[in-house]
């Protein structure tokens, strides 16, 4: 059963990565016009598919990875809040002329990205003493979140700035879920 879930998680992360890269071709990734939500104004159904696939892939990876911690269910409130954020993002247009929808969309997007990023960082923070690779992942996740926030404040939103932490999440969670942890045997 666990092996099946691992395979499903890897397949979801792979599909989400490929789909995100393909979806990003509708805009210029390093410009504001390449922001995932901006692309979604013209390609609403594709944006919805991207959102559902991204949320599902990250949540499945997070759920499996949290099974390696002593706090196996700690991810649940984060996933609920993140899911609510993604629902707000997908249900409301990123159109400044529709002010309420615009603000709800932005609120949802921020909730999804911030809460998911914090959850992944927390996961590796909890695992950091278990193995050095998790300490490295913890620092990596923290640095990516901080650098991404700084880039977002300086350059505004672009597809690359939005996608970097998502891709990092896919990679870090996939590696974590495929790793075998060393089991200490005491005699």
Residue positions per predicted region:
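Terminal transmembrane helical module of multi-pass membrane proteins
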Residues: 125-187
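Membrane-interface interhelical loops and short amphipathic "cap" helices
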Residues: 28-42, 97-100
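Alpha-helical transmembrane segments of multi-pass membrane proteins
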Residues: 13-30
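Membrane-proximal helix-loop-helix units in multi-pass membrane proteins
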Residues: 82-133
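Juxtamembrane "helix-exit" motif on the non-cytosolic side of transmembrane helices
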Residues: 24-28, 65-66, 91-99, 126, ...
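Aromatic-anchored segments of alpha-helical transmembrane domains
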Residues: 17-22, 81-91, 142-153
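Interfacial helix-start motif at the membrane-water boundary
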Residues: 37-56
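Membrane-interfacial loop-to-transmembrane alpha-helix junctions, especially the N-terminal start
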Residues: 5-13, 69-81, 130-141
């Amino acid at each position: 059963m666990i092996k099946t879930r691992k395979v499903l998680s890897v397949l979801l992360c792979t599909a989400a990565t490929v789909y995100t890269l393909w979806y990003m071709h509708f805009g210029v990734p390093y410009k504001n016009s390449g922001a995932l939500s901006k692309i979604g104004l013209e390609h609403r159904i594709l944006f919805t598919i991207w959102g559902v696939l991204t949320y599902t892939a990250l949540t499945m990876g997070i759920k499996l990875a949290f099974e390696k911690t002593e706090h196996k269910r700690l991810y649940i409130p984060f996933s609920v809040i993140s899911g609510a954020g993604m629902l707000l993002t997908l249900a409301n247009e990123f159109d400044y002329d529709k002010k309420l929808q615009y603000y709800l969309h932005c609120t949802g997007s921020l909730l999804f990205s911030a809460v998911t990023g914090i959850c992944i960082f927390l996961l590796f923070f909890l695992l950091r003493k278990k193995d050095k690779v998790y300490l490295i992942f913890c620092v990596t996740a923290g640095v990516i979140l901080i650098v991404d926030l700084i880039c977002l404040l300086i350059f505004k939103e672009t597809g690359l700035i939005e996608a970097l932490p998502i891709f990092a999440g896919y990679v870090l969670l996939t590696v974590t879920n495929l790793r075998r942890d060393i089991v200490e045997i005491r005699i």
